[in-house]
A protein has these predicted regions:
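Metal-dependent phosphoester-hydrolase catalytic domains
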Residues: 16, 201-212, 220-343
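Extracytoplasmic/secreted cell-surface and envelope-processing proteins
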Residues: 34-35, 95-98, 122-125, 183-186, ...
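N-terminal, active-site-proximal structural segment of metallo-dependent hydrolase catalytic domains
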Residues: 15-104, 108, 114-126, 194, ...
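Active-site-proximal beta-strand/loop segments in catalytic clefts of secreted hydrolases
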Residues: 27-30, 89-92, 115-119, 131-132, ...
Length: 343
């Protein structure tokens, strides 16, 4: 069954009504590289002779670890089903994705992927994993990051992987992002936010009923100007206007102090999934006749957290301080759950 009977205590609805539930996730893969050089890319650190001594053993373990975590995403709510879609960042190429979806936990569910090779100098791209039993892709486009200043004409970074398709019988769009790094400065992430907003607005102009989700590692918090002002991702459902988006992660960071990556002992929440207004129940409504947002989750399984040492309590990353930890990622995964009443 790809549905869940949601009882009174969850949604305060008729306990005998059936609702289909869909998990949509995002997970930064933290340098999911193979062991081979890609021409024109600065991937030398992730070669057997590179600084990380990235050999077959480490690569094989990385694939196994990431597949485990990806397959577990969403299973708290949807056991044995997991997420319908998962956006990825920091994947090197299609070879890596072929190897990833061939891992038993993902292969058992038949996950496929969407990927377009991008211009990032390190060779890291975004991708979208999807379960073809739940999501049917229709269009795919990598919208480029367009530098705005003459001095940045040679600035090559990740574009915005834009995928449309059907989920739960409805037209949806997913924009998977990995915005410029913190080292670049906030200006470049605000440029990215403006460009993503333009993509989102264009989709809604062309298809007014389409439901749009922007997801990714934004390298900014929900409270940052790029997210809160430029993308206009609001903290409260009832604050969201027709040109805005809803950011369910805002209060998780601002009020609860929880996040997806740790820096100098404090949490940031760079990994976000934000939603268009037509995915919300506003002003106290409980109308699930079409796909609507239900709740969100930062995935914190024990095996994803460093249990000892200097980095205790932080995400268990692949390497730290030059030491291979056989971990997962320096980021935690995130999931939003969407609900639709079964007809």
């Amino acid at each position: 069954m790809l549905s869940l009977l949601l009882v009174l205590g969850l949604l305060r609805l008729n306990a005998q009504t059936n609702y289909s539930v869909y998990g949509v996730g995002f997970y930064n893969q933290e340098n999911l590289f193979d062991t081979c050089h890609d021409k024109g890319k600065n991937d030398y650190d992730f070669l057997p002779t590179g600084s990380y001594k990235w050999d077959k053993l480490k690569y094989t373990n990385k694939l196994r670890n990431m597949a485990r975590a990806l397959a577990d995403m969403g299973t708290d709510v949807l056991p044995k089903v997991g997420c319908a879609m998962i956006g990825l960042s920091e994947v090197e190429n299609a070879r890596v994705l072929d190897a990833l979806v061939a891992q038993p936990p993902l292969a058992a569910r038949g996950y496929r992927y969407i990927h377009v090779e991008g211009p990032d100098r390190r060779g890291i791209d975004c991708a979208l994993l999807y379960n073809p039993q739940l999501f049917t892709p229709q269009t795919v486009k990598l919208v480029p990051y367009v530098p705005q200043l003459p001095k940045d004409s040679a600035f090559h970074t990740r574009g915005y992987l834009t995928v449309t398709g059907t989920l739960g019988g409805e037209h949806v769009a997913v924009i998977v992002c990995h915005w410029p790094s913190r080292y670049s400065g906030s200006y470049y992430r605000e440029v990215a936010a403006a460009q993503v907003k333009a993509v989102k607005d264009s989709l809604l102009r062309q298809h007014p009923a389409i439901k749009v989700m922007v997801m990714g590692d934004m390298n900014d918090d929900p409270t940052s100007r790029s997210m809160a002002k430029v993308l206009s991702a609001k903290a409260e459902v009832d604050e969201v206007g027709k040109d805005d988006m809803y950011n369910p992660w805002y209060n998780i960071l601002a009020k609860q102090g929880r996040g997806t990556l740790m820096y100098q002992g404090g949490w940031n929440l760079f990994d976000q999934i934000v939603l268009s207004p037509n995915m919300l129940n506003q002003n106290g409504k409980r109308d699930f006749s079409s796909l609507k947002y239900w709740k969100c989750q930062i995935v914190r399984y024990d095996y994803l957290i460093q249990s000892t040492g200097k980095y205790k309590g932080a995400p268990k990353r692949t390497t730290a301080g030059g030491v291979w930890l056989n971990g997962y990622s320096d980021h935690l995964p995130v999931v939003v759950y969407l609900v639709k009443k079964q007809s």
